């Protein structure tokens, strides 16, 4: 069952696509303490709102 609501968390692959980087590079970022990634079982997910804040912090802009 799919919801029309925006997902709160996305896969590392989806994050890579949004950031315009390779999947292996996204997994490297996911291992960093300052990157908004977390684990659910064996899956690594990225907090969508946290990702936007992280990008803003990296570019020196406020969200």
Predicted regions and their residues:
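Polyanion-binding surface elements
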Residues: 1-29
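A detector of low-complexity, intrinsically disordered, Ser/Thr/Gly/Pro/Ala-rich segments
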Residues: 22-23, 42, 57
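Residue-level detection of the helix-turn-helix DNA-binding "recognition helix"
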Residues: 31-32, 56
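Short Lys/Arg-enriched helix C-cap and helix-to-coil transition segments
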Residues: 38-44
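A short, Lys/Arg-enriched interface patch at domain edges and termini
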Residues: 51-63
């Amino acid at each position: 069952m799919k919801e029309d609501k925006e997902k709160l968390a996305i896969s590392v692959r989806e994050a890579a696509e949004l950031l315009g980087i390779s999947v292996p590079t996204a997994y490297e970022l996911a291992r960093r303490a300052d990157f908004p990634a977390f684990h659910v079982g064996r899956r690594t997910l990225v907090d969508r709102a946290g990702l936007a804040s992280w990008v803003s912090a990296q570019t020196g802009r406020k969200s």
